[in-house]
Amino acid sequence: MINHNLKLKIMKNLTLILITLILIVGCQNSPEIVKESWIEKPVSSWPDFALTNEISFTEKTYYDVANSFLVNTGFDTIGVSCKHIFMVFENQLGLNSIDLGSNFNYWKMYPKNHKEKAVTLKRFINKNPNEQIGQFNTLKVRDWIIFEIEGQNNQLYPLKIRYTPVETNEIVYAVGWGMMQKDNNKPALIKLQCFKNLGDYFYIKPLETDTHPAGKSGSPVIDKNGYLVGIVSGQEGNLGVIGGVKYLTTLFDKYDIEYNNSSH
């Protein structure tokens, strides 16, 4: 008959084996996150992914307005900018909904000072003549506009998406041009820290004092591995507001845009 101490020893060993197996299986099922090849290079060597906009209407053409970027869904490339740019159109052109209207001519995205690399937008995917523009406090939860682009442009780099949420205190980076930026040869890289994530958007604290947020709306926000985690939306007091990828995927689902979120 097996004595009591031997039984305890066997049970202990079986427990250790079970825990080890669980850890091994768990590690095997966790996908390895691969850094983008350019992320550890100098910013001057990064591919062109931070863009600005030229938007033409019959009454007016806007040059170098706000920021934008391209996104790799895993199946296609789409153009992205910030919805609150419609507040400008409302004030200056009289638009009253998320629709570019009958006087719209064209929209191009390009790296600042390099219009020869421009991509032209073909279709405004999430336009909605029934969606009121509203004020920023209502726009911040839905501050993404997405576009089908004309053809492919190998001179511009579409960002890959990170689908997991940004965590409190995580460091992320905004990449784009601002109105007060002195050197426009390359977009500015701004280091940010997540203060609180509310799902469709999150609050950040800038970790640099001379950031001048004006004009950076629509800039992509990337994580330490170079993956897209948000879009620069606005400012509330001392905190910045970043539109989260969660709302972007809501748009993908709504408009039947195929995407691959199996990586991370």
Locate each region found by the language model:
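Short, Lys/Arg-enriched N-terminal segments with co-localized hydrophobic residues
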Residues: 1-10
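Sec-dependent signal peptide recognition
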Residues: 12-18
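C-terminal motif of bacterial Sec signal peptides marking the signal peptidase cleavage site
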Residues: 24-26
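Bacterial signal peptide processing site
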Residues: 28-30
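Catalytic histidine site
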Residues: 36, 40-108, 233-237, 241
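Active-site region of chymotrypsin-like
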Residues: 43-66, 150-157, 181-264
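Serine endopeptidase catalytic core focused on the charge-relay Asp
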Residues: 65, 72, 80, 90-91, ...
